[in-house]
Amino acid sequence: MSDIKKVVLAYSGGLDTSVILKWLQDTYQCEVVTFTADLGQGEELEPARQKALQFGIKPEQIYIDDLREEFVRDFVFPMFRANTVYEGEYLLGTSIARPLIAKRLIEIVNATGADAICHGATGKGNDQVRFELGAYALKPDVKVIAPWREWDLLSREKLLAYAESHGIPIDMKHRQGGSPYSMDANLLHISYEGRHLEDPSAEAEEDMWRWTVSPEKAPDAAEYIELTYAKGDVVAIDGQQMPAHEVLAKLNELGGKHGIGRLDLVENRYVGMKSRGCYETPGGTILLKAHRAIESITLDREVAHLKDDLMPRYASLIYNGYWWAPERRALQVLIDHTQAHVNGTVRLKLYKGNVIVVGRDSKNDSLFDSTIATFEDDAGAYDQKDAGGFIKLNALRMRIAAKLDARRK
């Protein structure tokens, strides 16, 4: 008899997690609490409630939470303050959602007195690591059930057979072979993996993309937008203030319309393998370009360079599941400190897959001094004679080394 009496399941309402729900009831003879997160994935979530009820889950044990604002405000925006990119390209759309889901799972564990959490991540991927590192960081003694590491339902056929034998409804798409891709979506991105994408030499089919038009089919006329920044975060689009999640949703709409944000990537998973995935991150692509633009006039040079030096480590921490680790929190304090004066506006041109910065301004925090930088008469603001001594001092070590090399010959 298991000592696990109550489990909080991260539940989508789809086939896999519905099978997991029934499997938990049968294998552990335990009470199941379901948790479904609305992260802006664009799916109707009420069916998840109805399916949970069909499994005998009590209404008060079904959690369907709208986390869109918290997701963007407390996770996506802090990440973009660092200009975060993993391996030069990936904007971490899946990675950044997992710590919030882990946090909410633990909150529900504490609220319901559950013994364990359960997730549907496979034993091959990064998500199992992200969910579990987050859970252990927030509740060290929590138990974790990962069915894909325990059961023998390791093929689509076995999963379907289990569902059929236990009366779990099977959508027609699953009977016909399922979705052609494994997809994950939230307000920041949508990802595609599996099937023919497992051949890294094969081009993704055009009808795969859901959020963006092909750049070739994007409007022939460019569209200009203005983003307003306060302490490193976008607070308004074209002068209209809006909550964080509405900012990202609007940028997704604008970017998708203009074919912005497509990515085909082979990435290095934390568990050791290489994986090919395709991503659409229209709003995030705009955010990254705009944030670097506003920082270009408001950040000190050495602070900006320090941020760039630290960014790959920060990105790896998020990708690998260490959002709740002390080193990520420490880096966040530094990053947030640098954003105190990142205020102003950025004007962008959106055109056929491109985000083009056409202007940036900060009334009170710009370090750009036109009286010094001008090519015209600066009225003595900058004494060009000073540059000679500056250059000689910086060249000193190289001159000494060159003289030594000459003597060695």
UniProtKB/Swiss-Prot annotation:
Disulfide bonds: none annotated. PROSITE patterns: ARGININOSUCCIN_SYN_1, ARGININOSUCCIN_SYN_2. It comes from the Bacteria. It is found in: Cytoplasm. GO terms for biological process: argininosuccinate metabolic process; L-arginine biosynthetic process; urea cycle. SUPFAM superfamilies: Adenine nucleotide alpha hydrolases-like, Argininosuccinate synthetase, C-terminal domain. Its main location: cytoplasm. Keywords: Amino-acid biosynthesis, Arginine biosynthesis, ATP-binding, Cytoplasm, Ligase, Nucleotide-binding. L-citrulline binds at Y90, S95, N126, R130, S182, S191, E267, Y279. One of its GO terms (molecular function) is argininosuccinate synthase activity. Its EC number is 6.3.4.5. InterPro entries: Arginosuc_syn_C, Arginosuc_syn_N, Arginosuc_synth, Arginosuc_synth_CS, Arginosuc_synth_type_1_subfam, AS_cat/multimer_dom_body, Rossmann-like_a/b/a_fold. Pathway: Amino-acid biosynthesis; L-arginine biosynthesis; L-arginine from L-ornithine and carbamoyl phosphate: step 2/3. It catalyses: L-citrulline + L-aspartate + ATP = 2-(N(omega)-L-arginino)succinate + AMP + diphosphate + H(+). GO terms for cellular component: cytoplasm. L-aspartate binds at T122, N126, D127. ATP binds at A10, Y11, S12, G13, G14, L15, D16, T17, S18, A37, G120. The keyword Manganese does not apply. It is an enzyme of class 6 (ligase). Homotetramer. PANTHER family: ARGININOSUCCINATE SYNTHASE. Belongs to the argininosuccinate synthase family. Type 1 subfamily. NCBIfam families: argG, PRK00509.1. This is Argininosuccinate synthase. It comes from Thiobacillus denitrificans (strain ATCC 25259 / T1).
